[in-house]
């Protein structure tokens, strides 16, 4: 919690300075800092709630297309500042999940995709692809996998096995952007609590793909 409090103070101070020293400037810079604050506060809140997640669950039908659009809308400032464009494909699927927790997970993954975009690419070349696929039925169940793929800087191979560890920032977090090391940890833990599978593949200089697999029985689909 202390780490979050420290990180929250920085954008608050920056927002105050921008507002005080540049009263005639557009509000974009202030909005950017406030978006950072909202993201950090959201992480802190979901971390606190994760201890009693069973009491906060509400599993129901979730339209992937709608929840992805909501997550992107709430992260619009992050994408604009990073010059990243979202692309969609085959999201017309309904899954069983808690919409609040799933949207939080998506927002964290989308923030990371924008934060670690490739600085050598022009704004129109920085892309995040969001897509989904449904598996063939097997032993009474089927699964839907949601993919968040980017063409960013990628994750060093030696960091891949630790990116879901609590507090791990890795080389990218230290070099390119300030990181609490809690976003991906929370995503992984919340996925486990909802019986979802979160995986990642990445190559430095090429980008990363995060996958969320949601299993469903035939009775869930009826």
Question: Across the structure, where does each feature detected by a protein language model lie?
Answer:
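Acidic ATP/Mg2+-coordinating residue in the GHKL
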Residues: 150
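Glycine-rich GHKL/ HATPase_c ATP-binding element in histidine kinases
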Residues: 206-210
